[in-house]
Amino acid sequence: RDVAPSRGLGDVYKRQIYIGVDDKDIDLFESQYVVPNGVSYNSYVIMDDKIAIMDTADARVTDKWFANLREALGDRKPDYLVVSHLEPDHASNIQKVAEAYPDMQIVGNAKTFNMMGQFFDIDLTDRKVVVAEGDKLSLGKHELTFVMAPMVHWPEVMMEYESTDKVLFSADGFGKFGALDTDEDWTCEARRYYFCLLYTSGAA
């Protein structure tokens, strides 16, 4: 549910590595949407002079997600965790990864941090990087530009555009239900995804 990743743990444009996890055991996404082909929890690592983790994953796949993260990092440690929004399938492991890497900074917008205390008991004093529309974060060769996208489909949603490889990390803005290795009618599922998750959150 972001930029289209390669299958498994592979490079997505040079040094942008997919560390997400397929979940084929789930029957209902968010306890309401039927997902006969499961879902994918999409997460990435951008490897550069500075390392950024782009979202985490659902608590259902914590162990596998951490294994993918550690494989991608090797002997390095992340500098940033970029939080697109706090929906559990993107954000459930924020506290665990913040505790695992105590020097890592957390990147979000003002609404992100206003809401975070409702989900996690975590002290982010001196660890918050608060961004707004158009702000930039340099990782070295890669640079992220932040685009606010409230109510797509949570109030604090933001997207990130990486200008070197021209990749948009679109949070829940584009995509479909279904695990990545499922062969299905992409157009039909993308339409259902839009009307279930996005259409109801837009302006009347």
Residue ranges and their predicted role:
Residues 1-13, 199-204:
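Single conserved hydrophobic/aromatic residue that forms the stacking wall/gate
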Residues 14, 108-202:
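Metallo-beta-lactamase
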Residues 16-69, 159-162, 166-170:
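Conserved beta-strand hairpin/beta-sheet module of binuclear metal-dependent hydrolase folds
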Residues 49, 60-107:
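Active-site metal-binding motif and surrounding structural segment of the metallo-beta-lactamase
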Residues 52-55, 80-83, 146:
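Short catalytic-loop micro-motif centered on adjacent basic/acidic residues
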Residues 55, 87-89, 172, 202:
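Acidic active-site catalytic centers that drive phospho-/nucleotidyl reactions
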Residues 88-91, 113-115, 153-154, 175-178:
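Active-site environment of divalent metal-dependent phosphoester hydrolases
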